[in-house]
């Protein structure tokens, strides 16, 4: 963001940046200057031209300090919340961090012996406490995920060109050094052009293959490897040679170019050498991503459960390890004591649930104590649960089903307090919104995920209004705390079975074979459903209704719902 402001101040042409994105960045700058947290989920409703949630998330990734291609080590922005949080964590006695930061800390300690939670030379904290621990394996898995996109290469290419140009600036005034610098620039641009063309060819091939399969997400399996991968990897290896040449040039110019150096502003050959070294690491990481994502070198069907599920969504390839239990065991071993807490740590509070937990979380060695703490809530007095069995609510009924869900929302209006409706897909949610929007009473407001603001902003408005209607998908099934009458009716549109074509679900199911239903689908569904229903009762004084508009809950899955809910399930048409 600071670079864009700098370019604008210089009068540079920014026509390659979409006007809506510039408006978005301007709003971000105003938000942060006014005390904004810098966290994506806390984004307020943006003024100006609107963009859908996917486009806005892509804009955000270009300025996020958490992006894989961002290097914060030499950042001179003293007010950066990302850097400030890391500095505070390194000197604190108690560190409160999110799951991703705990996972990142472990990876850094394992790779380069560097901890985010301790100053150099000191041991990391002795005790690790993870709340909402049911979610931790996914966050941990993400630390070992890699991706391949045109944007990743474009960003790396620009950084390499900028760094080589800066090295050339130091060479001005010396004929020999300048000749070497110009030769280096020309050589790099040639390799970069080859990589650019071949990456475009890779993505054209992938999109063509995806269209053949008539799918919006291509799950890749052995045999789907890109046949011309070496045409990208070979010039990429030559780029490493260019970077080493640039480092040697920096070393040779040190005594001659010292007059141009300014350490405080980071304008020095020493700084450029460090920068070139880190860029070389990014080139190696891109090469590894090419192998895993397009070459399928670590696919789970080739090397087993620790291998990758790989997929292409039209914009990028992703490779993600399927099972990380062995790596989790290494994390637990790095702390003297580990405490995990969650209302849904075990899919079921019995032996099957405990066994699943041990296997999934990597507790295969050492002493472990597991238990279920009694709830402080009187669920039989505080919650009443219904399942709606009207024939129109069958999953195959499409728009008719959406109309019937809208009718249940309309009936809930006569009860005081807020209404939350949890969906398993954006499509069904948006169809129901079309039916419900014209009928919202004057004393209520309709808040829809992806249309009326970020998660934090929607929840704040929902709580403060006290009589609102909130429609949410995925992230609203958990991590939502709305005590009191602000939430008195919770409608669950459908039992949240994971989609079988989700990459990790497909991989886990394939590895589990005939036991997939019992060991994969049921535990994951149970935890999601229990999390969703848990949004209703947050204090000992809360009361309300749960309505599940999925007739399967009273049919073949009745036993399953009985295990998930803390109260009996009543039938209603």
For each of these PLM feature ranges, what is it?
Residues 1-93, 100-103, 158, 165, ...:
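A substrate-engagement module of RecA-like helicase motors
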Residues 67, 75-94, 98-250, 343-361:
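Signature of the SF2 helicase/ATPase Hel1-core->accessory helical subdomain module
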Residues 547-573:
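N-terminal targeting/trafficking signals and adjacent low-complexity tails
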Residues 340-343, 417-429, 547-549:
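Conserved RecA-like ASCE P-loop NTPase motor core of nucleic-acid helicases/translocases
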Residues 388-424:
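Conserved interdomain hinge at the start of the Helicase C-terminal
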Residues 388-399, 450-554:
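Conserved RecA-like P-loop NTPase helicase motor core
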């Amino acid at each position: 963001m600071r670079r864009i402001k700098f370019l604008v101040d210089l009068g540079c042409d920014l026509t390659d940046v979409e006007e809506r994105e510039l408006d978005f960045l301007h709003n971000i700058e105003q938000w942060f200057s006014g005390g904004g947290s810098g966290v994506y989920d806390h984004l307020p409703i943006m003024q100006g031209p609107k963009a859908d949630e996917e486009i806005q998330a892509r804009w955000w990734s270009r300025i996020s300090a958490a992006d894989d291609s961002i290097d914060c080590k030499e950042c001179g922005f003293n007010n950066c919340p990302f850097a400030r949080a890391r500095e505070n964590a390194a000197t604190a006695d108690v560190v409160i961090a999110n799951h991703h930061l705990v996972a990142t800390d472990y990876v850094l300690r394992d790779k380069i012996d560097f901890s985010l939670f301790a100053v150099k030379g000191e041991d990391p904290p002795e005790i690790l406490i993870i709340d909402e621990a049911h979610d931790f394996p996914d966050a941990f898995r993400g630390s070992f995920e890699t991706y391949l996109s045109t944007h990743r290469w474009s960003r790396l290419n620009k950084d390499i060109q900028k760094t080589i140009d800066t090295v050339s600036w130091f060479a001005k005034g010396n004929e020999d050094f300048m000749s070497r610098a110009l030769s280096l620039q020309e050589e790099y641009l040639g390799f970069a052009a080859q990589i650019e063309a071949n990456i475009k060819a890779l993505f054209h091939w992938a999109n063509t293959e995806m269209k053949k399969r008539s799918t919006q997400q291509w799950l890749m399996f052995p045999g789907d490897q890109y046949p011309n991968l070496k045409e990208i990897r070979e010039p990429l290896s030559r780029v490493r040679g260019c970077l080493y040449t640039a480092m040697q040039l920096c070393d040779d110019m040190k005594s001659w170019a010292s007059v141009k150096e300014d350490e405080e502003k980071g304008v020095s050959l020493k700084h450029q050498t460090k920068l070139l070294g880190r860029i070389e690491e990014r080139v190696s990481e891109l090469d590894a991503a090419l192998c895993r994502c397009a070459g399928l070198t670590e696919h789970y069907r080739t090397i087993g459960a620790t291998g990758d599920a790989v997929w292409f969504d039209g914009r990028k390839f992703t490779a993600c390890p399927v099972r990380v239990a062995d790596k989790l065991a290494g994390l637990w071993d790095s702390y003297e004591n580990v405490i995990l807490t969650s209302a849904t740590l075990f899919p079921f509070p019995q032996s099957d649930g405990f066994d699943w937990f041990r296997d999934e979380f990597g507790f295969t060695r050492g002493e472990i104590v597991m238990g279920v703490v009694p709830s402080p809530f009187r669920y039989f007095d505080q919650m009443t649960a219904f399942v709606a069995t009207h024939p129109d609510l069958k999953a195959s009924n499409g728009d008719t089903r959406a109309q019937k869900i809208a009718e249940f929302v309309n009936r809930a209006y006569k009860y005081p307090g807020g209404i939350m409706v949890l969906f398993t897909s954006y499509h069904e949610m948006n169809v129901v919104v079309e039916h419900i929007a014209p009928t919202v009473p004057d004393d209520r407001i309709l808040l829809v995920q992806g249309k009326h603001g970020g998660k934090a902003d929607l929840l704040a408005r929902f709580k403060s209004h006290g009589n609102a209607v909130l429609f949410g998908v995925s992230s609203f099934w958990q991590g939502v705390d709305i005590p009191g009458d602000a939430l008195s009716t919770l409608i669950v549109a459908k039992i949240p079975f994971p989609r079988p074509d989700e990459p990790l679900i497909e991989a886990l199911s394939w590895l589990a074979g005939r036991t997939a239903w019992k060991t994969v689908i049921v535990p994951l569904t149970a935890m999601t459903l229990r999390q969703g229903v848990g949004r209703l009762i947050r204090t000992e004084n809360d009361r309300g209704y749960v309505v599940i508009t999925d007739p399967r809950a009273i049919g073949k899955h009745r036993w399953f719902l009985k295990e998930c809910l803390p109260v009996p399930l009543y039938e209603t048409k």
